[in-house]
Amino acid sequence: MENTQENPTDQTTEETGREAQAAEPAAQAAENAAPAAEAALAEAQAKIAELQESFLRAKAETENVRRRAQDDVAKAHKFAIEGFAENLLPVLDSLEAAVGDTSGDLAKVREGVELTLRQLTSALEKGRVAALNPVGEKFDPHLHQAISMVPADQEPNTVVAVLQKGYTIADRVLRPALVTVAQPK
């Protein structure tokens, strides 16, 4: 009887040879792909390093801007009244001159006080401080403080007299005016 079946060893050798031939292009492709993958990896790592450096620079710049802003605010608070104080210096000079005057001339003293009052009023106006003199106006509890109510010929709740002026600075009340108000009839 003739052996029609091939030797199993021969078959395995042939399969191994075919597999080796088929694996060769795959191995070669893998070898070719490895440098490309390494290059892509190196490029990605370089990009990451660049982005990290850019992030750190941006973070440092943001911190510098924040610090400068804080310094500016601190300086603004520290020197906020500098201009106002400069406007008050002539008033101080006038008061010192009046104290140093020993002439005893009341007319001269009165004139000096009036001049000093004008200087002070001017300094306050430059600092946006405005006087409240609300005679004849309707009573406003935000601007006025009623001390008393008196019978008057004026409309009820109208300011009849100002006992002490009030003051505002840039539309904000520094001190309300002390007033007497017409009582309802």
From Swiss-Prot:
One Pfam family linked to the record: GrpE
Cellular location(s): Cytoplasm
Stretch list, region Disordered: 1-38
UniProt entry tagged with the keyword Transmembrane helix: no
InterPro entries reported for this sequence: GrpE, GrpE_coiled_coil, GrpE_head
Biased composition (Low complexity): 19-38
Keywords: Chaperone, Cytoplasm, Stress response
Sequence ranges of Polar residues compositional bias: 1-11
Record-annotated membrane-spanning stretches: none
Entry's Gene Ontology BP terms: protein folding
Gene3D superfamilies assigned to the protein according to its UniProt record, in alphabetical order: 3.90.20.20, Head domain of nucleotide exchange factor GrpE
GO cellular component: cytosol
Molecular function as annotated in GO: adenyl-nucleotide exchange factor activity; protein homodimerization activity; protein-folding chaperone binding; unfolded protein binding
Known function: Participates actively in the response to hyperosmotic and heat shock by preventing the aggregation of stress-denatured proteins, in association with DnaK and GrpE. It is the nucleotide exchange factor for DnaK and may function as a thermosensor. Unfolded proteins bind initially to DnaJ; upon interaction with the DnaJ-bound protein, DnaK hydrolyzes its bound ATP, resulting in the formation of a stable complex. GrpE releases ADP from DnaK; ATP binding to DnaK triggers the release of the substrate protein, thus completing the reaction cycle.
Quaternary structure note: Homodimer.
Similarity annotation: Belongs to the GrpE family.
Protein name: Protein GrpE
Species this chain originates from: Burkholderia mallei (strain ATCC 23344)
